[in-house]
């Protein structure tokens, strides 16, 4: 499956692992870059999703905000753990793709099709957990990496809320990591980061 959208080219490829008779896995690409790999049952095969899943359980069960829908694996997971989930996604086409190929089964999630920056700016609700998983191709749009953006994100969180952020950093360029961390530190006291060198 391949279809252009206003926000880039979306492509889904199915494959059987190790040329076996196992169930088909599906990969979601945006503008040629992998966004997620999901088994037929909807379980993500990407390491970072499992890290986010485990870390999210440190939060009180309550309201969760997911910025970036992708293949729908994370919203699916959070719903299964009884979170009240709001999802912000700029590209409406991702929902139909996630439903058809990635076993996304919307139950109670509220999905808002708009730019994450705009949503955060006008946000009135307080969230126990916010997950930022925003990519355009192989990078994050610049307006979603600023101190101002994270200041507004913080305003959408309860006092002891948790923010999980998935981002791509070139580990060969120390200054890039320093920039990302200094941006987080401008608004948040306790920061933990994990690397997945396979990505």
Cite the ranges covered by each PLM segment:
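Conserved SAM-binding strand-loop segment of SAM-dependent methyltransferases
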Residues: 104-116
